[in-house]
């Protein structure tokens, strides 16, 4: 049973009053002093109007007028400055850093060498554009499902998986998916060294690379770079935070939508290619470097959701946002008529009514380096099986 824990969303927070600026405080104080000064001056002039010559009265009135005019101009300037400060304070601040996390040097340097020697492959941009149109085309429909309570949605999604706990990792298996997912909190390089000690064969390694690391070359933007070294296939989804921060005035919810959609497509591109080529996939989870909890939840949801879509040929059936909710929460995986889901099972060609022949899955293990998902599973309120006799990959 999934336990729904309430979290405070940014779109649910009541509007907070802005703290009074220094200019506003000075303005109020100046108005009080000016009123007091004018009151005293008026009383004095009335009392002395019959005693002072007209010349002195005119001079006194002129001085008072100059003081009033100067004070008024100062107050006007102060008020405008105060409005400017308040406007800056009200301006929405992005929850994503402008700098995209860079690829570790142990992978970046060989990648640059491969690029220089033209030993890399790029995904067809037409395919990327097509997926961008197919997957989550409506921001409003996505927002209704994914921003209502992302914490509950993640836990509901995890409840669809059988979770095995062993040593310092969690093993996730799904009834509709042959590959198992090994979740670890250890960094990619350390996990890779452990796999090397086990002498695994047909390994694929995936880690995001920043477009900045590639000198912002437009041909790599939002693409998937593939290269091979020493019988290991490397996959590099190209992530670019400024692509998300198109405008500083974009609503936060729109930025969350963009990061979810882009990461979903990155994962879909990666798995659509690698599941047919590598027996073991070692993946460093995609991330923007944001410390915002909701942003990190969107990064996780993109990963968890992509396996639902990978079960189908996107040309035949594209899952809608409300379908993810039905699958995760109500455990209702009914599909469109005459569409069967065998996209993530081995030996699909042997199934009698498998009309969804989209990939020949070769992968049996996906090793995901994700401290965030590891911690979330650790705190997940469900029964986890201790797999003492379960074969551990790493």
Swiss-Prot record:
This is Uncharacterized protein CPn_0129/CPn_0130/CP_0642/CPj0130/CpB0131. The chain crosses the membrane at residues 31-51, 57-77. Its main location: membrane. The keyword Cell membrane applies. It is found in: Cell membrane. It comes from the Bacteria. The keyword Transmembrane applies. The lineage of its organism: Bacteria, Pseudomonadati, Chlamydiota, Chlamydiia, Chlamydiales. It comes from Chlamydia pneumoniae. It is a multi-pass membrane protein. Belongs to the chlamydial CPn_0129/CT_036/TC_0306 family. GO terms for cellular component: plasma membrane.
